[in-house]
């Protein structure tokens, strides 16, 4: 193992950010500090009402007093905003834009693409609501509409503010509408009755909790439902850690053949599968190796409610889950076989043994605590992380539906901005690392201390299983030396189990700065989860 420390000068003060999903408190009508609100001041006030304290900016020549530059900045956001839409992450995009007066002669201003509507047209496809804040008669209502949609649907919204409209004052008094949608009472009552009947008639019910349980703040309700009626629980890979994985009712991640066979067997033998907030995606379903009988399923999400083959409309997801917990049903204690629940296996380090992917994840499992959050990228680092045991809820982040490479390092930055008491354990392949590694410079600037573990298997290993070729090879960087480039942090190069043990201990001890561990792996060495999937598909294809 080689290790090196890079140093830098004094660190600037960090910018902290926290966005909560609470309902907004009502702002003071059209007044701001005793003055009439402008479009810009009202937007800032409403962001604060929703708990927003800081903004992430895109570099550029800002065309007004907001963060994202027109087109060159805004369009750079498209891939990440598309991922947020797909995976239901509430994000507010605020973009500056040329002034309305400047547009009158249709000038070819720099940053413009086709016309002055191009950027907004693009974002309409990947957000749940968009608005051009160009009219003080409508801008305040449009701000409220978009922010409410962001919170209600847990998806991105886009606000475009021309630079000559920032200081336009309210024309008429405006008070936010705090009314909330309600469920159809008859549909809610009948859906609960059918769900109760199906659950009570079952001998082996099981819950599969998905990411929407976290997105909509329903973890306590779902856990309370499981505990009240003694129903075992699983999670999807996108919803992994939605509950503590050390909970006695927790079985593991269900994802068809990619998950442990014991979990797959238990779930697929169930006569009542209760899917709550679960995306039925190819990754969540183990590349469609999962087998669930719709006639035996209760399927509830923010967009759909189906009990067996009966569909119910106008039932709000949170209303259904909350009411389900309050139902009166018989309680049956069900024995969970010991081999189904996740177990941490003991292993002994062989110092001279070349490190393997399996051993790497076994080692990572040993260092996870209540103060760590696992952030994993796309590829075998994601599949291997399925078997990690996350002991505290909501301590696992991944793009397991949209699966855009390069997610993990920027996401770890966001995670630590939101909660600096957590230390990110970042799992990233060498290919994904090369896409977004320079965000480590921002982490260093803010004084953050992620531990970045690079699975250096000399290219796109997951793709090699699909089709081998030179297009899967990438430049062989000395990943641990990036700390020299950015001017701070520790770098470690690992080839053996002994190297790995020393590097992890040193990185954990280095609490004041980031660490990058470059783990050399064979190009053909893959995680147990990917091995399980390959084995299953080889028998069925």
Regions found by a protein language model. Give the residues of each.
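Glycine-rich, acidic loop regions that bind phosphate or pyrophosphate groups
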Residues: 95-141, 161, 239-340, 458, ...
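Active-site diphosphate/adenylate-binding microenvironment
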Residues: 40-44, 48-50, 61, 66, ...
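Glycine-rich, anion-gripping cofactor-binding loops and their flanking helix/strand elements
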Residues: 69-70, 211-300, 391-422, 434-438, ...
């Amino acid at each position: 193992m080689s290790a090196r420390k890079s140093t830098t000068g004094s660190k600037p003060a960090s910018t902290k950010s926290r966005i909560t999903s609470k309902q907004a408190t009502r702002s003071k009508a059209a007044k701001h500090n005793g003055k009439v609100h402008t479009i810009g001041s009202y937007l800032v006030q409403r962001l604060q009402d929703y708990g927003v304290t800081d903004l992430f900016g895109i570099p550029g020549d800002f065309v007004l007093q907001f963060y994202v530059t027109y087109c060159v900045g805004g369009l750079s956001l498209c891939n990440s905003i598309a991922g947020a839409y797909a995976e239901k992450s509430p994000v507010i995009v605020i973009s500056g834009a040329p002034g309305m007066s400047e547009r009158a002669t249709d000038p070819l201003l720099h940053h413009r693409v086709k016309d002055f509507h191009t950027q907004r047209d693009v974002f309409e496809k990947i957000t749940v609501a968009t608005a051009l804040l160009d009219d003080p008669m409508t801008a305040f209502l449009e701000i409220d509409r978009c922010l409410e949609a962001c919170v209600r649907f847990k998806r991105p919204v886009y606000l475009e503010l021309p630079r000559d409209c920032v200081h336009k004052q309210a024309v008429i008094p405006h008070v936010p509408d705090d009314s909330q949608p309600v469920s159809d009472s008859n549909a809610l009552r009948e859906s609960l009755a059918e769900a109760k009947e199906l659950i009570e008639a079952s001998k082996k019910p099981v819950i599969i909790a998905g990411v929407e349980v976290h997105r909509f703040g329903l973890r306590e309700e779902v856990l309370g439902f499981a505990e009240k009626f003694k129903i075992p629980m699983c999670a999807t890979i996108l919803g992994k850690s939605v509950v503590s994985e050390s909970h006695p009712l927790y079985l593991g991640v269900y994802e068809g053949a990619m998950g442990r066979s014991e979990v797959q067997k238990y779930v697929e033998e169930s006569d009542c599968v209760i899917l709550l907030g679960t995306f039925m995606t190819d990754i969540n379903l183990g590349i469609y190796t999962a087998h669930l009988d719709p006639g035996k399923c209760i399927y509830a999400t923010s967009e759909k409610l189906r009990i067996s083959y009966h569909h119910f409309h106008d039932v709000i997801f949170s209303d259904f889950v909350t009411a389900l917990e309050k139902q009166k049903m018989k309680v049956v204690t069900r024995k969970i076989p010991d081999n189904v629940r996740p177990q941490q296996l003991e292993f002994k380090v062989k110092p001279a043994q070349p490190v393997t992917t399996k051993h790497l994840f076994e080692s990572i499992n040993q260092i996870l605590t209540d103060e760590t959050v696992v952030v994993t990228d796309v590829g075998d680092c994601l599949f291997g992380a399925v078997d990690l045991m996350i002991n505290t809820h909501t301590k696992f982040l991944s793009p397991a539906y949209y699966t855009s490479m390069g997610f993990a390092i920027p996401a770890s930055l966001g995670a630590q901005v939101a909660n600096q008491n957590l230390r990110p354990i970042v799992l990233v392949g060498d290919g994904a690392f090369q896409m977004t590694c320079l965000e480590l410079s921002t982490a260093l600037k803010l004084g953050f201390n992620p531990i970045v573990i690079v699975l250096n298997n000399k290219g796109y290993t997951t793709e090699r299983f699909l089709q081998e070729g030179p297009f899967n090879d990438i430049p062989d960087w000395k990943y641990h030396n990036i700390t020299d480039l950015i001017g701070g942090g520790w770098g470690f190069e690992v080839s053996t189990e002994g190297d790995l043990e020393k590097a992890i201990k040193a990185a954990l001890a280095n609490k004041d700065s980031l660490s990058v561990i470059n783990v050399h792996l064979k190009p053909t060495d893959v995680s147990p989860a990917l091995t399980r999937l390959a084995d299953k598909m080889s028998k069925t294809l």
